[in-house]
Amino acid sequence: EGRPGVAATLRALNGALGRPAALWVKESGARNLRHRDFLAPRAALSAAFPGGQAPPEAVSAVPSLRGPAVLPLRVCRQTPAGLTVQVRRPEAFQRLLGPLPGPAPSAAGARTGCVVLHCPALRGPAALQPRHLRSVLLADHLAQLLRTQGVGVRLVPALTEERSWDVLRQLRICWPSGSGGSSLTDAVSALKAALGRCPCAAACEQGPGTAEGVIFKVHLKSFVEQQGLVGYDPNLDLLLVTEGTLWSLAELQEAVLQCPVSDLPALPASCFPSQSSCCSIIHVVNCEEEFQQQQLDVLWRILDPGAHTALQKHLVCGPVKVTNPSSPIGADQYFQLRKRQMYEASVIKYGELAQDEAWTEVIDTLTMAAIRFEMLSTAHRSQITLDLQNNSISTKGTKSGAFVMYNCARLATLFDNFQRAVERGTYPPLPPVSELNFSCLREEGEWLLLFNYLLPFPEVLQQAAQLPPPSSGIRITANTETVCKFLIQLSMDFSSYYNRVHVLGEPFPHLFDQMFARLQLLGAVRDMFHSALATLHLPPLSQI
C-alpha cells in the first residue's frame, strides 16, 4: 500500500456515499480529534439526502474502503454533528512512518513544464529597498517550491557585477549571475529592427526635448485595445524605449529559449492547471513598479507575438511599510539591523554569547529566518508593516522564524542526546521500523503531529506551488505564505507536545517500545522540518 493522503481519503469517503460533491471534511482541531477524524456535517447531508440520512448500506461500507492512498478507517457513526469516522490509528502510524515524508512521488520523476520567474527589482542601479527584497524572496521561494514539484525554473534577470549583492548572499537567495554576452547583443539588435517595422512605434533622434537614451516611442494603448487585452492599467499609453528596455526583453526571450524541449509539455496539473504546451512567464513585482512592468509586458507582446508572450502573468506584492524610520532604510541596513536585534535578543535569553564561528552562524541563520518569515508569512497581496524597534524581534514569539528554528534545533538535540546514550549503553539502538509498536502512541499530541502535519505535508507543498489556471486577466495569486504558516503552526503543536512529554525516559526495557515509537514519529517530524525549511533556503540548526 502506498503513502496515505488526505485528498484520496476524502474522495473515497465521498464516493462511498455515492456523491461526487465534497460532503466530508478533515478535522484538525485537537478537541474534535478526540472523537472523530473526518466529518460529513449534518447540513451537507441534509442538502444531499432526503431527511439528511445517507443510505445505511453506504455508511456500513465505509470501514471497508481501500486504496493505495486511502487511510485505514474504523466504523462510521451517526452523531448530532453528522456522520463521523475515525482512522485506525496504529495502522496509520505504521503506513506513514515507514517511508520518509516529503514531496509526492510524482515530483521526484522527470521534470515537466517550465516557468520563467522575472523579478524586475533586480534591474537598474538603485540599491535594494525592503519592498524589493519582498518580491525577490517570494520569487526565490516560489522557484524552490516549483522545483519540488518537478517543474523547470528559469530566473531572470541575471545579477550583474555593477551592484553589490551582499544582502542576497546573506539571505542565501539562489539567483544566477552573468553578463549575457553576444547572444543578448544580437537579440537587442533584432528587437530594434522589429521596432523599426512596428506601425505603433516611432524612432527618436537625440536632441532638445528628447530624454537621454530614448531610441523609440511606442503607443501601447492602441495595441491593448486592438487585441482586447484585459486587466491592464487604463493609463498605459506612450512608452519611451531605451536600450535597457530592449535588453530586459532580450533576457526574457533568452530564458524562454533555454527551456529544454523536454520542459515544454504542459506543467503538472497540480501546479498550473490547463496550461498550454509552452513555458509560462511570471513577473514577480512590487505594487509600486507594477505599471512599468505592464508597459514592458505589452511591448514584448508587440515585438514577439509568440504563445509565450500571451502567457505572461503578474504576481504583485503588496506594499512594505516601515514604521518609525529615522531615514529611508535599504535592504542591507534592514538585514544588519535585524542581525543586531537578533544577537541582543539571544543574549537576553541565553546570556553573553561566545564570539566564535559557530555562534556567528547561528545568529546569521536566525536572522535569515526572521526576515524570510517576516516577508513571506503574509499573503503576497497584503501589506507588510516592518517594525524596526528593538523589541520587535524576539526569540520567544511563537509567530517568528526564530521560534521555528528553535524547535528544529530541539529535535536535533533530542536525537543527539539519544545517540550519545546509545553509545554509552544506556539505550539499545532504534530498531527497524517494522519492529516498532505504534499502538504505544496514544498521546493526543502524537496523533495531532501525524494527522495535521505528516499526513498532509506533500499536499501542502503541492498547494504552495500551485498557480491558478490561465485567465483573461494578467494578475495571478499564489499561496506563497503556506509553508511559513505551516511551519509556525507545526512548531506550536510540536512545542506543546515536547514540553508535556518526556521522550527519553528511564532506561527500563518495558518503556523502550513507547520511546522507540516516539523517536520514529519525531524523526519523521524532524525530516519534515528540514524539507519545508529547504524551500526557504534555511539550513536546519543543530543547536541554539
Language-model features: locations:
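Non-catalytic interaction-recognition regions
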Residues: 1-544
